[in-house]
Amino acid sequence: MSASKILSQKIKVALVQLSGSSPDKMANLQRAATFIERAMKEQPDTKLVVLPECFNSPYSTDQFRKYSEVINPKEPSTSVQFLSNLANKFKIILVGGTIPELDPKTDKIYNTSIIFNEDGKLIDKHRKVHLFDVDIPNGISFHESETLSPGEKSTTIDTKYGKFGVGICYDMRFPELAMLSARKGAFAMIYPSAFNTVTGPLHWHLLARSRAVDNQVYVMLCSPARNLQSSYHAYGHSIVVDPRGKIVAEAGEGEEIIYAELDPEVIESFRQAVPLTKQRRFDVYSDVNAH
C-alpha cells in the first residue's frame, strides 16, 4: 500500500497528559478544555488531540458505575456534548480519552473511548477489549472485571487524513488489534492508557515501540499525569513512537502536553527499506489470518 493511501499529508498531533480523575466530573472536563485550548495556542496547526484514559472520573472499580454515561449521539450525555463542542470549536479530531459507558439495554459498564471529527460529530467509539485484571506480587492488584464488561470488536477510524486504530491501555499488550488496524491501512495506533508505576517502567516503552515496529505505524500512548494523592498512581510518560521504533516525543510524570508531527515519508521509506507488509506469510500462520 502506498504512503498516499496511508497518510495523506504531514499532521501535527498533541497528547494531553493531565491530572484529571478527580471526583468532580465537570472540573475534570474543564481541565481538559483548558489544556486543549493551551495546546491550540501553542501549536495552532494541530489536527489531532488525544486525552488520557479515565480522565473524567476516578480510576476505581467501585466508581465506574457512578460516573458512567449513556453514549447516544442523538441525546448527548455530559461528557459527549462537552467533548463534541471542543472538537468543533478548535476544528480538531479528538480522541476523547476514555469514560465509563453504560449500555442501557444490558446495564453493562464499559471503559470506552469516544472519537470526534472536526465538526464535533461522534464518529466512533472503542470499548476496551482486554480488561486489566492483574495480581502482581509486591505490586498491584486490580480487577476491572469486577465492574466492567469487555468490548467485542476492534476499532479503526477513517478520517480525511487516513485511518488510525484505537485501543485502550491493556489492549496494547495484545498485538492483534494493532495488526488488524494496520492491515486495514491505518497510519497509527492510539492508546489512551493509564499504566501504573509497577508495570510502566517495565513495559510502557517496550510495548509502544513493539507495536510501532511490528506494524510500521506511528503509536501514541496518552497517560494521565501522576497524582500521588489519588488512589491510583499513573505512570505518566505519554509518548509518540514512529514506525521505525524511534521515540519522537515523551512526557515526564507531571501535567504536560507533548507534540509531534506524523510524516507519511517516514512510513513510506521504512516500509520500502523493510517491506514487512509484503513478506508476511499468512499461508504459514493461517490461524492468525482468521478475522
From Swiss-Prot:
Gene name on record?
Answer: NIT3
State the CDD domains in the record. Answer: nit
Against Pfam families, the record matches this protein to: CN_hydrolase
Question: In Gene Ontology terms, what is one molecular function of this protein?
Answer: omega-amidase activity
Q: Catalytic residues per the record?
A: 53 (proton acceptor), 128 (proton donor), 169 (nucleophile)
> Which EC number(s) does the record attach to this protein?
3.5.1.3
- Keywords for this protein: Hydrolase, Phosphoprotein
Q: What role is this protein assigned?
A: Possesses omega-amidase activity. The role of omega-amidase is to remove potentially toxic intermediates by converting 2-oxoglutaramate and 2-oxosuccinamate to biologically useful 2-oxoglutarate and oxaloacetate, respectively.
A GO biological process of this protein is: glutamine metabolic process
The organism is: Saccharomyces cerevisiae (strain ATCC 204508 / S288c)
The protein in question is named Omega-amidase NIT3
Q: Does the keyword Protein transport feature in the UniProt annotation?
A: no
